[in-house]
Amino acid sequence: MALTPMMVEYMKTKEEYNDCILFYRLGDFYEMFFDDALTVSRELELVLTGKNCGLEERAPMCGIPHHAAAAYIPRLVTKGYKVAICEQLEDPKQSKGIVKRGVVKVITPGTFIDSNSNLENDNTYLMVISEHEDKFGIAMSDISTGEFKTTSFNNIKMSLLDEISKVSPKEILVDNNISEDLLEEINNVLPVLITKKDFNEFLVSKEELIEQFSDLEVSGLTIEREIPSKVLLKYINETQKMSLTNINLLEQYEIINYMTIDGNSRRNLELTESIREKTKKGSLLWVLDKSATSMGGRTLRKWIDEPLIVKDEIEKRLSGVEEVFNSIGFNEDLRSALKEIYDIERIVGKISNKNVNAKDLLSLKSSLDKLPCIKKLLKDTSSELLKGYYENLDELIDVRDLLNDSIKEDPGLGLKEGNIIKDGYNNLVDELRQSKLHGKEWIAALENREREFTGIKSLKVGYNKVFGYYIEISKSNYNSIPEGRYIRKQTLANAERFITEELKVMEDKILGSEEKLINLEYSIFVEIRDKIEKEISRLKKSARIISDLDGISTLALVALENDYIKPEINTNGLIKITDGRHPVVEKVIGKGDFVSNNTALNQTDKELLLITGPNMAGKSTYMRQVALITLMAQMGSFVPATSANISICDKIFTRIGASDDLAGGKSTFMVEMWEVSNILKNATSNSLVLLDEVGRGTSTYDGLSIAWSVIEYITKNKNLRCKTLFATHYHELVKLEGILPGVKNYSVAVKKLKDSVVFLRKIVEGGADESYGIEVAKLAGLPENVINRAREILEDLESKNTFDINKLSSCSMVSNNTKEIAADSIKNEEDKVISNAQNIDVNETNCNYNEEKILKIETQNSEYEETIKFLKSEIKELQESNKKHNKKHKDASNDNMQINFEVMEKENFIKEISDVDILNLNPMEAMNTLYKVVTDAKKLQ
């Protein structure tokens, strides 16, 4: 059986857009067929039906009314689907045969703007990633605002992932030949829709790129920036089915001009969303975003995501905030005007996309009405930033006047319903309106006349789109109708509808006038829209100034409300904060209840602050507080402190909190080590590093060794030595102060009471001598008998603890800055093992065992002699292996330094042997111990 002609056309269109859900217009509905119908029915919970399409079985089908599409499409796009809208391109009444249809738009996660959502303060970025030789190239665009920018950088995977984390695009385009490993890592950072294209074929020409932007902008592109820009423009044109005039500026930027914050650090610092709820509330953005406009909200988020690292730029923004901060009346007047401004950027985007309506243009007019007032307020400002805003703000008087003269104050909802153009703007519109008005008056007069003539008081003249005008008389009055006066038109359950020749003639006149008026108003509206479209560059420029001005005004307002101060900025490595506060925590618990703290970091004696103290005492909050104050200062904001002098940081890294990647097969400890490794590889001497509880995911001594080794790596590596806050439970590490350069002990103050402790939340100089873990457990409500037993166990363990950091700190350090046990320490352990074995009194052992299961031993003396001989040979091999390992690492470059886990494993193995109490083992236990030693030794080879 063959498909019906309509389904043949459908299949052709579907084949062209096979990666999309096809919304196929049939009359007043969008219909979906086959797999699309199954998907949409499942995702939108719609009834699945069927349609005869010429095949043996009915095709699965579901549909939605065309006027309700705006409610359904966002739900599909949010789930990561693309939707192709196929419309009827001709009037079905006038077509012969199959109605001509075509796809008018493809809606994807990266190109969809939902004006009804609550995310108007967020950008919707579409990103293209390309690789060219040894560089990554990126291009991105938000078509709703017209933003289009590109950058490139060395082929360093972490830089790419950091940029993706920062931009948070809704959709990513990659080349077909991208490696699966890189694709997986991108998905791990941001699970969004990724579309593959052949970048050799899917791109516009250089001439098309120049036509969209300018010869000057395009000629300045390197090849690694040109390719993704061409691909991005191609994708936008393909999905929008038109060239967007609001995308008219191609910006280039360098990632090194902004602070680098990796994805983990953004999450740990809760910059734009909280870790727990994944919402804006509880984040830094939640505290700072008191913006008056949607544009200002997007700008503030961008400033948080991209702190500056150029001193002049930071101080320029700070000076602007300071001027507004010092003039409360000025800021109140400014914000009063800003609150009347709509989202000009996105209105301009609608104008460009040809989907703007009359209400949007009214919103634009209202916004432009406020520009002269804002310019007047800026006239007497003195800071460089605000003066620049004053000089460059275009009031757009001509555009405002055009809108004021042409668009009605209460326009109709739809462009094809009329009632858009103001009286007096067009003579013909005025004439047609008069004709329409007279027609309505004639209808009212007809109704009164017929009521009097027939004596039927309930008679009425009505109208609907199907039957036109009619005279309606209830059936109870049917006998009162004069014979031959009316022509029956429609019969209802309780009434009859009629017409007269006179009414039919007038209907043609009235409806003719209405149709002409609607068509005329629409054509005039299009002319007005096109005139405004020519001024898009001016509109975008003023919108950018308004959004930046709103950002400055908001930062000044937040500083005033929360008692923030202007920070000083330096480049000499000094971070000095007096009475610093966590901006989010103090907002949640109240400023009066928050305990402020001082911070002093420098490049001499306070390079690494080693912070000890119990859980729940505030160590993590304090560390995040320092990072947030630094970030706020570099974004140009005032900060929560009584004074602050902040050295510019190129990067912020954090390793805070416990997390795992079970799906990726990574334990909590493995994830922790990966994060630490990433920090040690990528931090510089100008970075700020926050490390919280490094090593807690493994055994005590392993964790202590790793934590200690990391501290050494940071402080002794001349290429690193970054500003570091290092919080730990290992209070044994406090002895590193004075041994390692730049290490300074701090702790959380604790007040000891008779049966409990009080955490004072105050960071003070000096290390903690205990962890108070049992007190925290008590606060958490553990049973009293558990607490008491824990105290007993703690006392017993502490009495047996022989860990001596001074002994370890005297050991030599290999070239990779990782502390290893020196040769003499190894020898001591070996001697202990041999001594234990040689002092065995074989006469004390007497046992029986199964001769079939183990080798026959002639005498107990020979058994122990063999055991001792083996242990000596194993220790000798370990000595030789350790010597070779040390020599290998001595020759290694400092640039490739890594924590030596292999050596640590061997050290643990030797310690395990030395702890064996051979004197108390029977022959069977001795043989089992020997077997385990051999097995473990082989694993270390």
Curated annotation (Swiss-Prot):
Keywords: ATP-binding, DNA damage, DNA repair, DNA-binding, Nucleotide-binding
PROSITE patterns: DNA_MISMATCH_REPAIR_2
Name of the protein in question: DNA mismatch repair protein MutS
Cross-referenced InterPro entries: DNA_mismatch_repair_MutS (IPR005748), DNA_mismatch_repair_MutS-lik_N (IPR007695), DNA_mismatch_repair_MutS/MSH (IPR017261), DNA_mismatch_repair_MutS_C (IPR000432), DNA_mismatch_repair_MutS_clamp (IPR007861), DNA_mismatch_repair_MutS_core (IPR007696), DNA_mismatch_repair_MutS_N (IPR016151), DNA_mismatch_repair_MutS_sf (IPR036187)
Gene from which this protein is expressed: mutS
PANTHER family: DNA MISMATCH REPAIR PROTEIN MSH1, MITOCHONDRIAL, DNA MISMATCH REPAIR PROTEIN MUTS FAMILY MEMBER
Family, as annotated: Belongs to the DNA mismatch repair MutS family.
GO cellular component, one term: cytosol
The protein's role, per its UniProt record: This protein is involved in the repair of mismatches in DNA. It is possible that it carries out the mismatch recognition step. This protein has a weak ATPase activity.
GO biological process, one term: mismatch repair
SMART domains in alphabetical order: MUTSac, MUTSd
Residue sites binding ATP per the record: G613, P614, N615, M616, A617, G618, K619, S620
GO molecular function annotation: ATP binding; ATP-dependent DNA damage sensor activity; damaged DNA binding; mismatched DNA binding
